């Protein structure tokens, strides 16, 4: 059978399976591809193909993730599944594989377990706002009341972390039975029901081009007789010649300027959009007024901050991280977008130290402002090597 070409006209959504080890995340991923393959919407993957996920490096951190893609009648999905718990923690904090929503897999026979809780907590921290629940192994539970009890427990757990526990779709079924009987209507009904829920409950994400313009400044130079040019890759939004933008970060001052020219690959453009590497010619800006580490942004859409709370994963020794713990008041460099800024760390109350391999919430105070909003990723570096990776979960000031 020849491979069907994926239709790219459908909206694209990134999702992933989360949940406790051995509750059936990988089996479910295999079942989804196998059932959808019947309708020509996927290439069927076997359990082993997903389980032996290749290692990837994201900011120097090794993460095992399996990527599969499939489509429903309404959407095209990229789906990520991580074999190990540590891989989930690292993936979610570094944002290696972006997730717009998640399928929480929980074994109906065991109920919520420690990693069920941990993955829900992580999702709430890193901005995975929409979760659909699949109560797996439901065929192993004979007692209907017990099933209802587990569903209630999962809903309460979700509510505890500010998810709308009462409204979240919960689908019961068996991923294994569906995987082994992909042509059996009854066995695969739970998979179709799950994908219908994912289709309707997880919203289509806002495209990067629809967001307010932002470009991290990578380099600055002067064109004699024309003015100052800032170069970088547009992170989000669209920029037109004649737009007013602000230069933000590394100082309290916000400097406004008008973009009088946009250049890409030595050609002049009228507009640039997310993903483009450009040079922007800025009116009335001196070479000394702007530097790497600042951002150009649509006026009034982002602010410079010094103090924030971050969820951080601390690299293990084997990953090239520190060999020893660090303590309250530790002062490493925080790498945001294109620059390092020194900052000091305040550990949560009652925590003496942080060991390599831990993931924690920490309060950080930088020595200078950086343009930031919630969800911004950063690396923690010490003498040029990465010792941690984090995401801004809330801004203090």
UniProtKB/Swiss-Prot annotation:
Q: Which Pfam families does the protein's record reference?
A: GTP_EFTU, GTP_EFTU_D2, GTP_EFTU_D3
Molecular function (GO) terms for this protein are: GTP binding; GTPase activity; translation elongation factor activity
Catalysis performed (reactions): GTP + H2O = GDP + phosphate + H(+)
Q: Where in the cell is it found?
A: Cytoplasm
**Where are the residues of the annotated region G4?**
136-139
Q: Does the keyword Hydrolase apply?
A: yes
**According to the lineage, what is the superkingdom?**
Bacteria
User: InterPro entries recorded for this chain?
Assistant: EF-Tu_GTP-bd, EF-Tu_GTPase, EFTu-like_2, EFTU_2, G_TR_CS, P-loop_NTPase, Small_GTP-bd, T_Tr_GTP-bd_dom
Q: Which residues bind Mg(2+)?
A: 26
Region forming the signal peptide:
none
Family matches, as SUPFAM superfamilies: EF-Tu/eEF-1alpha/eIF2-gamma C-terminal domain, P-loop containing nucleoside triphosphate hydrolases, Translation proteins
Q: Where is this region: G1?
A: 19-26
What keywords are assigned to this protein? Answer: Cytoplasm, Elongation factor, GTP-binding, Hydrolase, Magnesium, Metal-binding, Nucleotide-binding, Protein biosynthesis
Chain spans, region G3:
81-84
Any idea of its EC number?
3.6.5.3
- Region of interest (G2), ranges: 60-64
Give the protein family.
Belongs to the TRAFAC class translation factor GTPase superfamily. Classic translation factor GTPase family. EF-Tu/EF-1A subfamily.
Q: How does it assemble?
A: Monomer.
* UniProt name for this protein: Elongation factor Tu
The record lists the lineage as: Bacteria, Bacillati, Bacillota, Clostridia, Eubacteriales
